[in-house]
């Protein structure tokens, strides 16, 4: 299913270390030629210090050749640099191992106060911060993400937000936690990084747009692994104008992930309201991006094309199975998508043949009847089954005037937001220049 693979698009906005899990996934799925993937890994590794990993990949790619001299020499250089940095950093790390320092770090949020404490008790100096940062970055480039995360934490609590490496250290800490699959810590770092980007008054609008675009892509790792991720992704991508604007302007392919999060959301009431807002965005962006997942929503909620929706649902399975971020959502997606088809069909018809429903849901009549019985039993559906006639008779779910007013108000607010974003989007398009220099750097933290 290479036609719908987004790895190349997404990789443009990731640190090179974050691309490795995606390539490993593609290798397992056998979507691409294995040699092409190995070449890709080797290219990514060329600007890192993961020399042993690079040697392993080289052996897999060229089994009959010796490891190049350049790689062997690079390994010697990296080991020497690591030893030197370890020697420089060792006395600094010992300061942080002091129990009193640990207590101070846990109790105070004032980095200046902590710095003064370390200076008074241990002779800590300003240049030690640069040493700590360089060592953390070197550890990261070697693939030692736990070490990088630890030293970046020390660095972060000591430096002010105005420090030249402050923002970079936040990116590095987030990447390290993602690569160690520490999802709670990664969610905290993601929130902290978002607040820093949103409150940054120094960056130009274009730089802020670029930062948010990177954050959107990095956040996929967290949102599709953290228990609260599918709620948070909706709040960030759909209901925060600056991030929705970034998606529409820079990366409409992210609509695949937003749509999946909405469809698989476990809060039924929230899901129904959010769907209405999502449909408007999908319609608006359909000329720039579409895939079976967004087209499924369009077929069902815009065109009311049930046959088209059923066809797209079958295609969705292939897309989900071959998407690194969405493969774990497959069962929830199929279950809820069937429910959406059923609910939409039922709004149009009061009495429905079970055999017709089975056809629309791509199930046997027996499976469809059992599925509907479970929905009724779990209070997710107001309906009765007439087993003799093989019909489902829908109940009457009248919406209160109060609820109608609320929904219309929400709809108006959302339309106003969309109008404002379209104006901003046109202004951004007219004033766009080259991306900030760090966006082109894909080694280290960013």
From Swiss-Prot:
Keywords: Cytoplasm, Initiation factor, Nucleus, Protein biosynthesis. It comes from the Eukaryota. Coiled coil: none annotated. It is found in: Cytoplasm; Nucleus. It comes from Xenopus laevis (African clawed frog). One of its GO terms (biological process) is translational initiation. InterPro entries: eIF3e (IPR016650), eIF3e_N (IPR019010), PCI_dom (IPR000717), WH_DNA-bd_sf (IPR036390). This is Eukaryotic translation initiation factor 3 subunit E-A. Signal peptide: none annotated. Belongs to the eIF-3 subunit E family. Component of the eukaryotic translation initiation factor 3 (eIF-3) complex, which is composed of 13 subunits: eif3a, eif3b, eif3c, eif3d, eif3e, eif3f, eif3g, eif3h, eif3i, eif3j, eif3k, eif3l and eif3m. One of its GO terms (molecular function) is translation initiation factor activity. Component of the eukaryotic translation initiation factor 3 (eIF-3) complex, which is involved in protein synthesis of a specialized repertoire of mRNAs and, together with other initiation factors, stimulates binding of mRNA and methionyl-tRNAi to the 40S ribosome. The eIF-3 complex specifically targets and initiates translation of a subset of mRNAs involved in cell proliferation. GO terms for cellular component: eukaryotic 43S preinitiation complex; eukaryotic 48S preinitiation complex; eukaryotic translation initiation factor 3 complex; eukaryotic translation initiation factor 3 complex, eIF3e; nucleus. Residues 222-399 form the PCI domain. SMART domains: eIF3_N, PINT.
